[in-house]
Amino acid sequence: MSEEGQVNLKKKEKWGVAHIYSSYNNTIIHITDITGAETVSRWSGGMVVKADRDEPSPYAAMIAARRAAEEAMEKGFVGVHIKVRAPGGSKSKSPGPGAQAAIRALARAGLRIGRVEDVTPIPHDGTRPKGGRRGRRV
């Protein structure tokens, strides 16, 4: 066979970005293309469970992440870079209980995992936190 007959049809792998927003009230998994401009898939804990109290649970995050990963893989994505975000600002700076479960579920669903980074907004002395002068008294 000649060189022209054997054209190497190596397809470029499609990678995306999984934006995981995890608070103590819900977990949102939003998969976009690599630029972040086009939404590929979006699921939240509230979309997969009935009870409001179950929205932030690791189980809900796991189901939502699996469904988001399946949708992304149907559209030809082979891997994702992960950006984890907590509420941040004057609110909680630590991600909720669903963040860890969502990352593991994405990997288990068959997507390759690239970089994992924390993009929680950190205030540089921004707005005053709620709770008044002496804080929340428990």
Curated annotation (Swiss-Prot):
Keyword Cell wall biogenesis/degradation tagged: no
PROSITE patterns with a match to the protein in the record: RIBOSOMAL_S11
InterPro entries named among the record's database cross-references: Ribosomal_uS11, Ribosomal_uS11_archaeal, Ribosomal_uS11_CS, Ribosomal_uS11_sf
Any one annotated GO CC term: ribosome
Record region (Disordered): 116-138
Domain of life: Archaea
GO MF: rRNA binding; structural constituent of ribosome
Entry keyword set: Ribonucleoprotein, Ribosomal protein, RNA-binding, rRNA-binding
Key word Aminoacyl-tRNA synthetase present: no
GO BP term (any one): translation
PANTHER family, A to Z: 40S RIBOSOMAL PROTEIN S14/30S RIBOSOMAL PROTEIN S11
HAMAP family, per database record: Ribosomal_uS11
Assembly: Part of the 30S ribosomal subunit.
NCBIfam families referenced in this protein's UniProt entry, alphabetically: arch_S11P, PRK09607.1
Family: Belongs to the universal ribosomal protein uS11 family.
Annotated function: Located on the platform of the 30S subunit.
Protein name: Small ribosomal subunit protein uS11
Organism: Thermococcus gammatolerans (strain DSM 15229 / JCM 11827 / EJ3)
